[in-house]
Amino acid sequence: MTSFPKQPVRRNSRSLLLGAAIASSLVLSGCAGSGGEPADTAYVARDVETLYTEARDRLSRGNAPVAAALFDEVERQHPYSPWARRAQLMSAFSYYVAADYNKAIQSAQRFLSIHPGNKDAPYAYYLIALSYYEQISDVQRDQKITEQARTALREVNRRFPATEYATDARLKLDLVEDHLAGKEMEIGRYYQDSGKWIAAQIRFQNVVDNFQTTSHTPEALYRLVESSLALGLPSEAKKYAAVLGANYPGNEWYERAYKLVQDKAPSLVAAS
């Protein structure tokens, strides 16, 4: 029975040793020898065991792009073999190792479309989520991929909550949501600098409402104090400052918010 790798290797920690460990875990009972090494992956009719083993060996030696192509050949040449199912998921993993994340996603999705109830479905969903996660860029760029990573990680957690994949997905979700909140904060600050206070208020409120467990919430509340005062809403500013103080006492953003309200709306502070 095939045992797929539990934790796909990350982009910044990929190694030949781990690749070899992954490959060795995929040895199948009755597997034939590796045979000769083809110069490329052009179509050459080969028996399924030889072809699969060649793909596995290429992966173990760190040649993930060729391994992926060879695993694809297993399915193409032997579509009705039990090896084809194994090769589909190993193709997805090989593309992931090769940092060809779009193909990794496509291969894993193909596996799930054909084998939705397979025992390795949790791994396929997890691999899709990681392939999106690895493509997350800095907050200055479009966050479409980040949203896709968030959706995919949530799907892993929803479908397989008791698995180790879900445990890791939850950890990554925290990072993803912090990233998305950071983007909202960047846009909100831009609107503030442009004097578009209502637009800024909407962004900061979104952080407070939808990303309240992230590290950006204290600043978002402070920015809501700022924008409320700029809009001539001192009572709203006081409300946000109070929420900030109740949830983050001693935080530098609360100290700044308190001072700001004291300077801009001293009568409200005196009345409190």
Language model features with spans:
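Acidic, polar-rich low-complexity tracts and alpha-helical solenoid repeat scaffolds
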Residues: 2-14, 22, 27-272
